[in-house]
Amino acid sequence: MKRNLIYLIILIIIFFVFYVFFKGLNKVNIYTPNEITNKKIVNFSSKELYTQKNVSFSDILLDNKFTIVNIWSSWCLPCRDEHKYLIKLGQKNNLNMVGINYKDDPTNAKKFIDQFGNPFSLILIDKDGTIAIELGAYGIPETFIINNLEKKIIKKYIGPINDENFNDIINLIK
């Protein structure tokens, strides 16, 4: 009788462990990819990828209503997946697109842009990752929508842009 009780307890524990494991597998995204941040932009400067000129972030926020800032790298596979969406966004006239090349070799970054196209009006080099940290990035790719008038991040997308995010961005910048 005591032996049966021990087997039953072990079986219940095993069942519980499997339940928790499989429940965890069903989580689609552990982050909040469409978080509205309302974080004020801090001014910083960095070198531009092609011209090597120092550019301050306040110079980037142009007369356009919105700026999209995308953090990417040539070695990042999800960055390749989202690039077609960035190309489409880069064709919008009312939009300023800035790329932040994260912890990458500038030669590889240029090859990436040559191969896949350049959706950005400007690409800043973030060799040590400090710009990404200032913006509040968790990793790459990440995309931020900035309201230029208020100089605030109004939307943040963690992970690659997909169909759903793309449509959300289009509706937001109308």
Language-model-detected regions and their locations in the chain:
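Thiol/disulfide oxidoreductase modules built on the thioredoxin-like
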Residues: 114-119, 126-173
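Conserved redox-active cysteine motifs that mediate thiol-disulfide chemistry
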Residues: 71-88
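Short, Lys/Arg-enriched, disordered terminal segments
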Residues: 1-6, 26-32, 58-59, 91-92, ...
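Conserved segment of the thioredoxin-like fold in thiol-based oxidoreductases
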Residues: 91-92, 96-128, 140
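Hydrophobic beta-strand anchors of alpha/beta hydrolase catalytic cores
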Residues: 68-69, 97, 143
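N-terminal targeting signals for export/organelle localization
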Residues: 1-47
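A short beta-strand-turn-helix
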Residues: 45-67
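Short pre-active-site segment immediately N-terminal to redox-active cysteine/selenocysteine motifs
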Residues: 40, 65-67, 71-75, 139
